[in-house]
Amino acid sequence: TVLMIDISHSMILYGEDRITPAKKVAMALSELIKTKYPKDTLDVIVFGNDAWQIEIKDIPYLQVGPYHTNTVAGLELAMDLLRRRKNPNKQIFMITDGKPTCIVRNGKYYKNSFGLDRIIVNKTLNLAAHCRKLGIKITTFMIAQDSYLQQFVEEFTQTNQGKAFYTSLKGLGDYIFEDYERNRRRNVR
């Protein structure tokens, strides 16, 4: 299992602290996996302009940065980590509040925060489809209410044949654990 946490600047925009609940969920999920499913693995990655893996012990100290949202970089790293694991339970939980706004093209950042940029969106959707072909389900936890962003998440979810939850910050943890349990049981049977 890979948990992707969005640390782009929008995670603290407009007076809403979305990063603190995301960190709490990540810590609780890691505890659940370690105690109830000790044979499973949990890799935690964060993504902004780039994506990188962090240690579980570093989750409480996560901070957002002046980053855009490079969902592609996060998915690429998650896929790479899952390919190296022998566990049958290959899934990605992605906590995000917004649209993808950044990719790397020809070694340079290509960014666009205005609307949904088709170049960025198409690359993101292509990776969602590639995850599906590899048997990697993506569960997206959307913690923003914008209808056009929800439409993007719906398209992303359909492409991957994964799941999406549109949730408030309060109910975020319940959704993750319910879905993890459901996926876990299905993979064990």
Predicted regions and their residues:
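Residue-level signature of catalytic and energy-coupling elements of molecular machines
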Residues: 26, 78, 157
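Generic hydrophobic secondary-structure packing signal
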Residues: 18, 22, 70, 74, ...
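Short acidic, glycine/proline-rich loop/turn micro-motifs
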Residues: 12-16, 56-60, 104-110
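Flexible beta-alpha connector loops of hexameric P-loop NTPases
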Residues: 14-18, 61-70, 113-118
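Von Willebrand factor
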Residues: 1-56, 59-95, 100-102, 139-148, ...
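Von Willebrand factor type A / integrin I
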Residues: 82-87, 99-102, 106-189
